[in-house]
């Protein structure tokens, strides 16, 4: 698991930093999360929110100020998780306890996305909110596993199949920019480590430019 310092860099990446290859994507991800918080969370400050698959809790700083309590849900091997996931996949929490479940870039890593979403639905109150982000296109990144990618319609379907109503749906970056991101990532690990940041410094501004002129 990454350190808390790495979590801060995930929120505010530097183009010359260790997450330079994901610079633009991480910025857009944070901005979309901030937008969703502003739309659906900020005006209801007494809510209980749990980060489902919290890792090192990178998004706690931008979520916690707007809820009554922020909790982390993760596997038992995560020492900073407040609530654990049993080996069966069940969240160790009673039904209908949470107002908001936050899931950022986790769904692609779980063995059984259906069960994962069922558990999110179970622990949410009847009018609860699931804030979910995952990948359409992305390079293979096991942590410790990496199983799934979705089209927009495929993602909507698996979420709706588990009883959720989709009220907001937004891509992070457009197809042209994503194509350049994948091109960069395809080259990245062919290069010596000392050259990889240089490739990111060259590619990330192009990804930003093409996303702005071809945004869908």
PLM regions and their residue ranges:
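Conserved N-terminal segment of class I S-adenosyl-L-methionine
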Residues: 1-96, 100-104, 117
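S-adenosyl-L-methionine-dependent methyltransferase catalytic module, highlighting the catalytic core
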Residues: 19, 111-119, 123, 129-216
């Amino acid at each position: 698991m990454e350190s808390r310092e790495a979590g801060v860099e995930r929120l505010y990446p530097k183009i010359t930093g260790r997450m330079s290859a994901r610079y633009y994507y991480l910025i857009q991800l944070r901005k979309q999360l901030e937008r969703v918080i502003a739309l659906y969370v900020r005006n209801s400050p007494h809510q209980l929110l749990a980060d489902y698959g919290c890792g090192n809790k990178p998004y706690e700083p931008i979520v916690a100020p707007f809820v009554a309590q922020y909790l982390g849900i993760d596997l038992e091997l995560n020492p900073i998780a407040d609530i654990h996931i049993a080996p069966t996949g069940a969240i160790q929490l009673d039904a209908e306890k949470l107002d908001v479940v936050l899931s950022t870039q986790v769904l692609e890593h779980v063995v059984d996305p259906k069960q994962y979403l069922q558990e999110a639905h179970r622990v949410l109150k009847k009018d609860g909110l699931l804030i979910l982000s995952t990948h359409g296109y992305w390079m293979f990144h096991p942590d410790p596993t990496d199983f799934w990618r979705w089209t927009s319609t495929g993602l909507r379907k698996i979420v709706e199949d588990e009883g959720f109503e989709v009220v907001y749906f937004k891509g992070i970056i457009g197809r042209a920019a994503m194509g350049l991101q994948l091109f960069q990532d395809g080259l990245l690990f062919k290069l010596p480590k000392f050259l990889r940041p240089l490739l990111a410094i060259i590619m990330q501004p192009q990804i930003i430019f093409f996303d702005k002129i071809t945004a869908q």
